[in-house]
Amino acid sequence: MKKILLTFLMLFASLSFAGEPEMGVNFDKTAQIVPTDNKDKIEVTELFWYGCIHCYQMDPILGDWVKKLPKDVYFKRMPAIPRPDWAPMARAFYAMDTLGVGEKLHTAIFDAVHKDRTLNPSDEKAILQWVTLKSGLDRKKVEDAFNSFSMNASLNKAAQTFRASGATGVPTLMIDGRYITSSTMAGGNNESLQIADFIINNVRKDRNKK
């Protein structure tokens, strides 16, 4: 009897999620339309923070999903800056990208914060030292990247994008600069990716009608 009941509950759960996602529940419109980098593709942006444990847990799942994306979908990460103490890790993200070590150190910096607990995500001096050590690059070169002329513009854009998205937390996925979903809205990490797939398919259908 217990086995039958468990089977029924699992079936019910799968059927309840199989229904079409609801606007305002599982996903929502962005507060403002956010311009995308690539007009020819459907852009998916992950808004995240290296200091966020939920982003850390989401990262390997998201990575597997990104590998399977069709050619008409473009994925990128953008650091979220809803408050000043998130800025040091955003600065690290852009500096590592400029130095060409972004992909190499992406998982490592997450691990340093959450697994090893050897890096304070709000301590800019410690973060700069970590990037210098792990990249093997000259400290002056790393400092120049952290304080480059374009850095403030990148940080301002990231902060503006987070506000325009209407996101209230991270990780949040923004699709086509017009829709957002998250594990909180969708009911889990895998579910948020299913919602993202749903939105991507609808955006594709709308584009094909034009």
For each of these PLM feature ranges, what is it?
Residues 2-84, 159, 163-164, 201-210:
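Extracytoplasmic thiol/disulfide redox context detector
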Residues 55, 85-86, 120, 155, ...:
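Alpha-helix N-cap/helix-start motif
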Residues 39-41, 89, 169-170:
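A structure-centric signal for secondary-structure junctions around beta-strands
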Residues 14, 112-115, 148-152:
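A short structural micro-motif
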Residues 20-30, 119-125, 195:
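Periplasmic c-type cytochrome electron-transfer domains
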Residues 4-5, 133-210:
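C-terminal cap of thioredoxin/glutaredoxin-like
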